[in-house]
A protein has these predicted regions:
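Conserved hydrophobic positions within beta-strands
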Residues: 82, 175, 214-216, 249
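Short, surface-exposed secondary-structure edge patches
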Residues: 50-54, 227, 267
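Active-site flanking residues adjacent to catalytic metal/cofactor-binding acidic residues
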Residues: 92, 240, 251
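Catalytic Cys-His active-site segments of thiol-dependent hydrolases/isopeptidases
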Residues: 159-161, 249-252
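RNA pseudouridine synthases
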Residues: 1-185, 191, 295-303
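Short, surface-exposed loop/helix-turn segments at secondary-structure junctions
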Residues: 201, 250-264
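The conserved catalytic core of RNA pseudouridine synthases
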Residues: 128-160, 168, 172, 187, ...
């Protein structure tokens, strides 16, 4: 059992207790914290509260996180949006809210559970039992194209392409504010945040080099629709880089200074639109694009109507 305490800051005031904790610990779901709250493993100012309690500035929230237990990852019949498939690779369009592989608080309903059911025993095993077939990841609330490897040979090949930065990865996203330049590049090494352990940050001393190219697709009142091309693939790269220049992604509570005015929006507006790579067996260049999810299309329409 691990116990930690957090002081509520001004920009976090008004959040539900379960949501506040899921922001602090993005690897755990709100349902996970609702169970902890119900079992009185969460307190506010040393007093148990309901999950619906809205935290106040200077509240001290204390949580007891149970020790991780080993679990068997089971195949689950979860529908997949498949963009391409052959004997070596599978390209899927990951939906919003789906974690790529099991982790503490997310032992089921992950992409790994889904691909284990779909592919049976034909998945690479290089990343172990928890991450079969997984050669790269995108965040839980980021949607879009992702490569799954169906054998170890394909996995080694694709992993090398990623290491050499030769995989073409194009994202689209909506950021807060009006980006002045039509295009540009953000360069800044990314590492763990020195204080908030769940966040990444620009860290030139201890971080890894990261480069993000961007292009403005459309401007709205107070928001900008953008395209991003990654040279590197660091954790939360686009989210950290855009926040570092004053334009956090719409809906990204972790890296913005306040809550989104769009109450229905859960998580950042970021979509892995296109992925291109050399096929590990044929040597041919392949490129696939995932259509924008419905929530993203609706958000664009809403922003256009308010311009």
């Amino acid at each position: 059992m691990k116990m930690e305490s957090f002081e509520v800051e001004a920009e976090q005031e008004g959040e539900r207790l379960d949501k506040f904790l899921s922001i602090i610990y993005p690897e755990f779901s709100r349902a996970f914290f609702q169970k902890l709250i119900k079992s009185k493993q969460v307190s506010v100012n040393e007093t148990p509260q309901k999950a619906s309690y809205c935290v106040k500035i200077d509240d001290i929230v204390t949580v007891e996180i149970p020790d991780a237990v080993e679990t068997t990852i089971e195949p689950e019949n979860i529908p997949l949006d498949i963009l391409y498939e052959d004997d070596d690779v599978l390209i899927v369009n990951k939906p919003k809210g789906m974690v790529v592989h099991p982790s503490a608080g997310h032992y089921s309903r992950t992409l790994v559970n889904a691909i284990m059911y779909h592919c049976k025993d034909t998945l690479s095993g290089i990343n172990g039992e928890i991450r079969p077939g997984i050669v790269h990841r995108i965040d839980m609330d980021t949607t879009g194209s992702l490569i799954v490897c169906k054998n170890d040979e394909a996995h080694v090949n694709i992993a090398q392409q990623i290491k050499e930065h030769s995989v073409n990865r194009i994202y689209v996203g909506i950021v807060c504010g009006n980006v002045k330049e039509d295009s540009g590049t953000v360069e800044g090494a990314i590492g763990r945040h020195p204080i908030e352990r769940k966040k990444m940050a620009i860290n030139e001393k201890n971080g890894k080099p990261a480069i993000t190219h961007y292009k403005v697709l459309e401007r709205f009142k107070n928001y900008t629709y953008m395209q991003f091309k990654l040279e590197t693939g660091r954790t939360h790269q686009i989210r950290v880089h855009m926040a570092s220049i004053g334009h956090p992604l719409l809906g990204d509570i972790l890296y913005s200074s306040g809550r989104s005015p769009f109450k229905h929006l859960q998580g950042q507006c970021l979509h892995a639109k296109t992925i291109g790579f050399i096929h590990p067996k044929t040597g041919e260049y392949m490129e696939y694009s995932a259509p924008l999810p419905e929530y993203f299309e609706k958000m664009l329409c809403l922003l256009k109507s308010n311009t």
